[in-house]
Amino acid sequence: MAKKKGDEKANPAPQSDNEEQNFEEEPDFDDPEDFVEIPEEELLADILEQKPKESDGYENVVVVDGCPQVGPERLEKLQSVINKIFSKFGKIVNEYYPTTENGLTTGYIFLEYSNPQNAAEAVKATNNCKLDKQHTFLVNLFTDFQKYSDIPKEWEPPAPQPFKVQSDLQWYLMDPDAYDQFLVGIGTGVALQVWQNALPEPLLLQERPNWTETYAVWSPLGTYLATFHWRGVALWAGPKFSQFQKFFHPEARFISFSPCENYMVTFSPSGDRGDDKKWIIGDIRTGQEKRSFPPPDEYVTWPIFRWSKDDRFFARIGADVLSVYETPGFGLLDKKSIKIPGIRDFSWSPSDNTLAYWVAEDKDVPARVTLLEIPNRTEVRSKNLFSVADCKIHWQKSGDYLCVKVDRYSKVKKDKIDIKYSGMYYNFEIFHMREKEIPVDSVEIKEPIQAFAWEPVGSKFSIIHGDPANISISFYQVNTGQAPTLLKKFERKPFNHLFWSPSGQFIVLANLGLTGGALEFLDTNDFTIMNVADHYQMSGIEWDPTGRYVVTGVSSLKCKMDCGYYIWSFQGKILRRVMKEGFAQFHWRPRPPTLLSEKQQKEIKKNLKKYYSQFESKDRMRSSKASKELVAKRTEQMKKFTEYRESKIQEWNEQKPRRLELRDYVDTDGLDTDAVNTVEEVIEFFVKEEQTVIE
């Protein structure tokens, strides 16, 4: 071992010549006299920032106020309830229930989670949640107390944030050829595909595996795509379908949008938030939760909240009340619900802030249908109905007409549990919304009603009626100043559903179900049957927004065989068949209403012949281009096949010595074509015997 200079001087020792050659003098590592030492904090600042820091653990602790004050005998039950609610957000490693001198809990508790993320999630999910009618949780992080106590007395304005450029949300409307888009869901994973219905072949725009856990839906105007996840709902938008917004609502399974896409409602049948946040209304632009509601005491139909046409109001039914809320405050209109004893159902007009509701019979008081204006709560029209078992409200898409289907009875038998009706017959009460004093016409049908549908643009409606063995389809015309007239009646038809084109005039008659599949494409101008077709076991039909195409599909959720979808023209010509294993859903992307006035639309239709030559020329160019592309594609495929075949033939020839060696040098390559050396052996065996008696 080498020694320092000082040691060598103090303890000189004889050294041999070899030692002098093997050991060199050790260099001097002492700092110079003018050396200034640089502190580690300055020299290694970037490295020290990454050094793990000791945590005091307060970030993991939450304070829950608003708990019940209980004695020792009920403390265990309280702990069980608290753990059931708060353990859903993470592992609770410690809990503390302070008590008073009398042994009662103080009403606030401390819970410690295993990490800060779980604590923050618990605060976000449970703050202001109701435990029961008397107790509401007020939940904060323990560190919040220090944060709020350190707020400076003098306010400092926040620094302006840089503007974040959003992608174009209406990009899909800018396509020069006005191609529509559609969504395809595959499997239970669920993989999603977004296609553009281009010519000659649809174009795949986006495909992602496991994009949603259950299913996906478009918003009403087509701006957003909503997907479902365990922790909530995500909205996607823009050309690349990037995430636009996400809403925390564990195990949400249902969603509905307001008509103008300002708000959305989610429902979780078995959510993680307890019983007070089953329904949550969120602001789509900001992602904020605007209001939440507990579940109702009895069964309700989805959607429970129904919106007015301009997003100003939304309403729901309660026990003998109709609760109307207004935005953006989300409070009750005039701070109180409307008392309507016996109310059963309601529906908003698609074009006005008017809602229709019906009230059931009560002893000698007849049933009643009422039209109510909001927000002034004025009854603009009502009609009494007698011997009513049920009613269904059907608005025409333009809001020009309202139809109330009334199920009436001749006899009724009331048991302790159930009510049985007999001698049923049916009325269709037609309200003329655009006429003075809103006159009402009535159409009576004695046979059972299978389906009803308004023409979206026009004044016709269609009805499927009769027993399953003798189905008839009737078309009526609504007239001003007189009762609706029967235009056409088709008898003995095997259909159970009606699907009008969004642009009116054309309708598809369909038989949905595992044993169905029949289709009929009908022009209601002269009731010409344009085509008769079938799609066996089809489970759904959907028109595209323009009324040019219609899709039929067999979902794997209903049937495991022959899953896929067909695309038809509005005349019933099959354009494309797509068989896809695991096919689950198909939805056309909606379009917003046109910006053109009715006058401008009529002018375009009037001068449509001027544009025919342009359209035909463009179609010919597209067809020619498509043909060239198809020929080039097939030529390339044939070239690849020829190259592959030649390579395999060469490989087969190179393996011939090995084949001869394995077959004792007997050439068997040409046995199939050698008729001289080939022996054909026929073997017959008894299968079964049948005896037929001939008279």
From Swiss-Prot:
PROSITE patterns: RRM. The keyword Cell inner membrane does not apply. Residues 17-43 have a biased composition (Acidic residues). Coiled coil: none annotated. One of its GO terms (molecular function) is RNA binding. Residues 60-144 form the RRM domain. WD repeats lie at residues 164-205, 295-335, 338-373, 444-486. Its main location: cytoplasm. RNA-binding component of the eukaryotic translation initiation factor 3 (eIF-3) complex, which is involved in protein synthesis of a specialized repertoire of mRNAs and, together with other initiation factors, stimulates binding of mRNA and methionyl-tRNAi to the 40S ribosome. The eIF-3 complex specifically targets and initiates translation of a subset of mRNAs involved in cell proliferation. HAMAP family: eIF3b. This is Eukaryotic translation initiation factor 3 subunit B.
